[in-house]
Regions:
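A conserved acidic, glycine/proline-rich C-terminal tail/linker
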Residues: 98-104, 120-144, 168
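Short acidic-glycine loop/turn motifs at beta-strand connectors
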Residues: 153-157
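Residue-level recognition of short, solvent-exposed, well-ordered loop/turn junctions
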Residues: 3-4, 54, 109, 146
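Acidic-aromatic/histidine active-site loop/patch
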Residues: 149
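Conserved, well-structured core segments that form or line functional sites
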Residues: 14-20, 27, 31-115, 119-125
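Single conserved hydrophobic/aromatic residue that forms the stacking wall/gate
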Residues: 1-6, 11
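N-terminal segments that mediate ammonia production and transfer
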Residues: 161-164, 170
Length: 170
C-alpha cells in the first residue's frame, strides 16, 4: 500500500466540489530520440486541438486538429479512450475524441469545461487492458504518451485551468 510521508506532496483533484483533470508523460533517465519526439508531438497535439476550442466550434473540430497533427508526424491516436467534460464529476459529457471529421458533435459554448487528452502511440492505435483491469498497454507493445489539461470555453480564447498559478508550465 502507498503511504505518504510528511515531506511528500500529494495531488488534489477537486476544489469546492469541482474537478480538474491533467496528466503528462515525462522522460525518466535516458530515453530514445523516438520517445522524446513522441512526448513532444503528444504535448503539441493538445495545443493544436485547443486552437479550435472556441465558442461556436464543434467538439470534432478539436478532435480533427489533434488527429491531423499527430498523423502528419507519423504517429497514431488511441481510440478507445477519449477526453471528456469535467465539472462536478471527474468524467462528464460530452466525450472529446482525439480523432474524427470536423464539424460534428456538440457546439462549444462559453462556460463549458473540457479535459482534452491526446494519447499518442508509435505503432497501432489499438490498446489492451491487462488482467488487473486498470493497466492499459499498446496492443503492439510500442511506446505511447499522454498529455492532458482541463480547459474552459470562453467568449474568446480557451483558458487552461490546470496550469500552476506560479507561472510554471509542464
Amino acid at each position: 500500500p502507498l503511504r505518504l510521508v510528511g515531506s511528500e506532496m500529494c495531488i488534489r483533484d477537486s476544489i469546492n466540489g469541482f474537478h480538474g483533470d491533467c496528466a503528462c508523460t515525462i522522460p525518466c533517465g535516458e530515453v530514445s530520440e523516438e520517445a522524446r519526439k513522441l512526448i513532444a508531438v503528444t504535448r503539441q497535439s493538445f495545443y493544436e486541438g485547443i486552437k479550435f476550442a472556441r465558442k461556436g466550434n464543434r467538439i470534432s473540430d478539436i478532435s480533427n486538429a489533434i488527429q491531423t497533427y499527430v498523423e502528419a508526424q507519423g504517429f497514431s491516436l488511441v481510440r478507445d479512450y477519449v477526453g471528456h467534460g469535467v465539472g462536478a464529476n471527474l468524467h462528464e459529457d460530452p466525450e472529446v475524441p482525439n480523432f474524427g471529421r470536423p464539424g460534428h458533435g456538440v457546439r462549444l459554448q462559453p462556460g463549458m469545461t473540457l479535459a482534452i487528452e491526446p494519447m499518442v502511440n508509435v505503432g497501432t492505435y489499438a490498446v489492451k487492458v491487462l488482467p488487473d483491469g486498470w493497466t492499459v498497454k499498446t496492443a503492439d507493445g510500442k511506446l505511447s504518451a499522454h498529455y492532458e489539461n482541463s480547459i474552459a470555453i470562453t467568449e474568446g480564447d480557451p483558458v487552461i485551468l490546470t496550469f500552476p498559478t506560479d507561472g510554471e508550465n509542464w
